[in-house]
Regions:
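Histidine-centered active-site/metal-ligand motif
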Residues: 38-40, 79
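Short, conserved beta-strand element in jelly-roll/cupin
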Residues: 41-56
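A cytosolic small-molecule/anion-sensing beta-strand core signal
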Residues: 50-51, 67, 85
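Short beta-strand His + acidic residue motifs that chelate non-heme Fe in jelly-roll/DSBH
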Residues: 56-57, 73, 79-84, 89-91
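Short acidic-glycine-tyrosine-enriched beta hairpin
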Residues: 59-76
Length: 108
């Protein structure tokens, strides 16, 4: 049995296996405001709110996340997540997701 945890800020990949990884996302500057969007060119990305509150933005829509529901952002869609200070979000994506296959746009 392997057990992983993360109680830091921002995002951390806590476990990887073959072609996928699980990360934990917590409050940090990057996730405190809706000031950018990103899209992954090689993977879908799934989010599960475990604690706190979060808003998931996808192109021209926003979703107030509900705990323990899976929100899957399809490959290539622009998105961003904003979380409360007490939030914890589980993130699942391909293990090779990186800056090389992700595009990011910032708003002025």
């Amino acid at each position: 049995m392997e057990i992983y945890e993360y109680d830091g800020k921002d995002f951390c990949a806590v476990m990887q296996y073959e072609g996928w990884k699980i990360g934990m996302l917590r409050y940090g500057d990057r996730f405190s405001t809706y000031n950018c969007v990103e899209r992954h060119l090689a993977t879908d990305e799934a989010f599960v709110l475990l604690a706190g509150s979060a808003t998931l933005y996808e192109e021209d829509q926003s979703f107030e996340m509900e705990k323990c529901k899976v929100y899957n952002v399809k490959r290539g869609l622009w998105h961003h997540i904003v979380v409360s200070r007490d939030a914890t979000v589980l993130v699942i994506e391909n293990s090779d997701t990186s800056k090389e296959n992700t595009e990011r746009k910032y708003f002025l």
